[in-house]
UniProtKB/Swiss-Prot annotation:
Keywords attached to this entry: Chaperone, Cytoplasm, Disulfide bond, Redox-active center, Zinc
Lineage: Bacteria, Bacillati, Cyanobacteriota, Cyanophyceae, Synechococcales
Protein task: Redox regulated molecular chaperone. Protects both thermally unfolding and oxidatively damaged proteins from irreversible aggregation. Plays an important role in the bacterial defense system toward oxidative stress.
Name of the protein in its database record: 33 kDa chaperonin
An MF annotation (GO) of this entry: unfolded protein binding
Subcellular localization, as worded in the UniProt entry: Cytoplasm
Posttranslational modification: Under oxidizing conditions two disulfide bonds are formed involving the reactive cysteines. Under reducing conditions zinc is bound to the reactive cysteines and the protein is inactive.
SUPFAM superfamilies, sorted: Hsp33 domain (SSF64397), HSP33 redox switch-like (SSF118352)
Record bears the keyword Chaperone: yes
Length: 305
């Protein structure tokens, strides 16, 4: 089944809900980049969060970038997500794997904090109208959910809960997705309702298991986690949206990027290497540019003064 996003409200319109399934997206990213289990999960969580953030943008061409800049062994992580349901991303050390951590109950989990280290989450929102909006917050845990919730609270002044999760088995990614819960201004004026919503969010346990159990039926997931808050998908065409991994890179874009190198560098590549090879960071597609194509680029540049 295709990955999808569902927009909904609950508590009589007092809270905004966005649920997403990203299993296929994460599987494709894992295959494209040769990701380990740890980096598959970290990039998957970031792509999930990026899609949930982009879902609130007013224009369909709007995009959200999430960048994790830290001193941890993952080095860096970058995600580009669109309001149109597309997403792409990469990590600095795709093969990174760390020993899992074990809690008092004997359960194992990924060591996100060690992988991320200390650093910042940088968020950029671009609606294509003037300068993009940029914001930076300190990393809370490196597990993405708490980090994005911190961004929403401190940069957008929107009380939010962000749940991201996955189930991993020996074959790879069994399930991946997330849930965004935001208290709307209407509910923020009612302390009792705010307290109830916060309590319900604290009571959400085993999110990854519940996500996997719901499969692609995200409406069932909403009913499962908020049974007494009457979650309802929006009553319009925006209620459900298909999601996919997509990168707009191309052979022509690769050649356009080479123009930035200038005449001397292009000439050197033509003469010494007989062409050029470019690899897209976001999707790992490779593009080969021949010596003849390099010559065409050189011929199109303004003559040297």
């Amino acid at each position: 089944m295709a990955d999808r996003l569902v927009r909904a409200t609950a508590a009589a319109g007092g809270i905004r809900l966005v649920a997403v399934s990203t299993t296929n997206i994460v599987r494709e990213a894992r295959e494209r980049h040769g990701l380990s289990f740890l980096t598959s999960v970290m990039l998957g969580r970031a792509m999930t969060a990026g899609l949930m953030l982009a879902s609130s943008m007013k224009v369909r061409h709007g995009r959200v970038n999430l960048r994790l800049g830290s001193d941890g062994p993952i080095k860096n992580l970058m995600v580009d997500a669109g309001r149109n349901g597309t997403v792409r991303g990469y990590v600095g050390e795709p093969a990174l794997e760390l020993d899992p951590i074990q809690d008092e109950a004997g359960h194992f989990s990924f060591n996100f904090k060690e992988a991320a280290g200390t650093g910042y989450l940088h968020v950029m929102r671009d609606d294509g109208k003037g300068e993009p909006f940029n914001s930076t917050v300190e990393l809370v845990s490196g597990g993405i959910g708490e980090d994005v919730a911190s961004y929403l609270l401190h940069s957008e002044q929107t009380p939010s809960a962000v749940f991201v999760g996955e189930q991993v088995n020996s074959a790879g990614i069994h399930a991946s997705g997330g849930l965004l819960v935001q208290i709307l201004p209407k509910a923020a004026e009612e302390p009792a309702l705010v307290e109830l919503i916060e309590q319900r969010c604290r009571e959400i346990t085993g999110f990854s298991q519940r996500l996997a159990a719901s499969g692609d039926q995200l409406e069932d997931l909403l009913l499962d986690v908020f049974p007494d808050l009457d979650p309802k998908p929006l009553d319009d065409a925006e209620a459900s949206q298909e999601l996919r991994f997509f990168c707009p890179c191309s052979h022509e874009r690769s050649k356009a990027a080479l123009l930035l190198l200038g005449r001397d560098e292009l000439t050197d590549m033509r003469d010494k290497d007989g062409g050029a090879e470019l690899t897209c960071h976001f999707c790992n597609n490779r593009y080969d540019v021949s010596a003849a194509e390099l010559q065409e680029l050189i011929d199109g540049l303004p003559a040297a003064a």
